Amino acid sequence: MIDFLGDWKRTHYCGTLTADDTGKEVVLMGWAHRRRDHGGLIFVDLRDREGLAQIVFDPDNSAEAHHKAEAIRNEYVVAVKGKVIPRPQGTVNTNLRTGAVEILVSACKILSRSKALPFTLDDYVDVAENLRLKHRYLDLRRPVLQDNLILRSKVAQVTRQYLTGNGFLELETPFLTKSTPEGARDFLVPSRINRGEFYALPQSPQLFKQILMISGFDRYFQIVRCFRDEDLRADRQPEFTQIDCEMSFIDREDIITVMEGLIARIFADVKDMSVSLPIKRMTYAESINRFGVDNPDLRFGLELVELSDIVKGSGFKVFADVVAGGGIVKGLNAKGCGGMSRKEIDDLTEFVKIYGAKGLAYVKVTEDGWQSPITKFFTGEEISAMTKTFAAEQGDLLLFVADKPKVVNDSLGKLRNQLAKILGLLDKNTFNFVWITDFPLLEWDEEEKRWAAVHHPFTAPMDEDLEYVENDPGRCRAKAYDLVLNGNEIGGGSIRIHQEKVQSLMFKMLGLSEEDAKAKFGFLLDALEYGTPPHGGIAFGLDRLIMLLTGSDSIRDVIAFPKTQKGACLMSEAPSPVDLKQLRELGLKTTGK
């Protein structure tokens, strides 16, 4: 029989009771996490979002409550009245906040029963993710996931407090908007009233927040959901959340200063950690040169070194021919890895091939010098020069890639990260920030044979590079900046184009005709002609930031109801077929799978 709550009122959360509460009469409510019958006394760990409390049913104290406790099973919802008492000597649990006390129960109500669980809710038990996602309402009871989402809520609160305190207004932008497919595919929403026409769910509030600046709101922010219909990876979701900000009458330094303050406040209030300000900066060119990527993880070394000048005249034809053909030769020193087996090196070779490299040359530095199939092709002077460039010592493993610059940097940059995983160099409790600046404005898309925006089409070129936009696009740098944390881009922003002529030129360089630009972005181009302040902003990926703050391995562990890598919600079974009547109302019909 199920009891009614009646006039009982909870007095405390389970996980908040300490020795200071000894002697208090309390009312607790929660889930029976674990029940233990000691042949007289019955112990139940009662759980809520704040933690566990041990409750004790003693027949000498309340025979009725003890009888009711005999029916309690895991995940029953229970309410108890009782007195906080010290635990007996030798039974204190120092791992729990409540570990010094227990509650001697005088009355008990069973408010709801539970079926047998499909999996246990202990954090340390490994459960298939699909099973967890199918029963997400149970999965979310696990303390580790509850802690993740509670921390997420705290980050949102701190963000709102900080930004409103710095003059930002929290303003909302539309979810039903115009499709402007530049990059990822849009999620489309058919209009019933305007048959044959569609809304799109926003990939970001970019255009609307710029228009808010044109409208004179000066400082805007929003913790906003965004949508992209793209192939998913471990750190991607079709719907994700951004901390979105925009400011008027500012330059890059103003934005960076304010946003560094936000990051420092979040880490101070949520992690009790100090972020050293100002955050280190690095240009895009330096980042690519030293680390092969534009989102370097600075928790470890393994920097890339340039060897082209040393090997261009060498007897090793593979290297010499690459340099003669306009390519480069770079490498990295895997310190102390000279003992790697041939199979392990072959695995690394297969890894770099994923990123376009044709192979991976290697050298083991031994007591007798270089040990490698390629050693014989180099002079003693060349070996000495490379040894110095690598800062190589006995026991090191030197790894080389020769190819086009992009292939070399991509493959070695990814190899650097892979080696860090293999060597255990990734400390989740270390947080290393860096701003990457001075990105290229445009890059050549070899497949589509046109220029593409490195960030997005609304990013302003450097003032001194404006003349290159049309005449030498590859030389033009952008007023763009990314904030990188432990190899993850957690924020990206730029100063925006605030002149209609420059924006129209940018669209032209991206291959949009004047008619296409007007059709897709006419409302922005029109707005730019009515007095637009210099403005810029940034968007932080909230999901990814929380993933790093909590040390989670997957972004799905910091989102309450995430999708799978196939974009499905296993709990609600979305997406799903819809009624034919609904499709007819929209003027649609499906063509099958």
UniProtKB/Swiss-Prot annotation:
Gene name of the encoded protein: aspS
Superkingdom of this protein's organism: Bacteria
Primary location group: cytoplasm
NCBIfam families on file: aspS_bact (TIGR00459), PRK00476.1 (NF001750)
Native organism: Geotalea daltonii (strain DSM 22248 / JCM 15807 / FRC-32)
One BP term from GO: aspartyl-tRNA aminoacylation
This protein's UniProt keywords: Aminoacyl-tRNA synthetase, ATP-binding, Cytoplasm, Ligase, Nucleotide-binding, Protein biosynthesis
Binding site for ATP: 228-230, 237, 489, 541-544
GO cellular component, one term: cytoplasm
Protein name (Swiss-Prot/TrEMBL): Aspartate--tRNA(Asp/Asn) ligase
Family membership noted in the UniProt record: Belongs to the class-II aminoacyl-tRNA synthetase family. Type 1 subfamily.
Binding site for L-aspartate: 182, 228, 455, 496
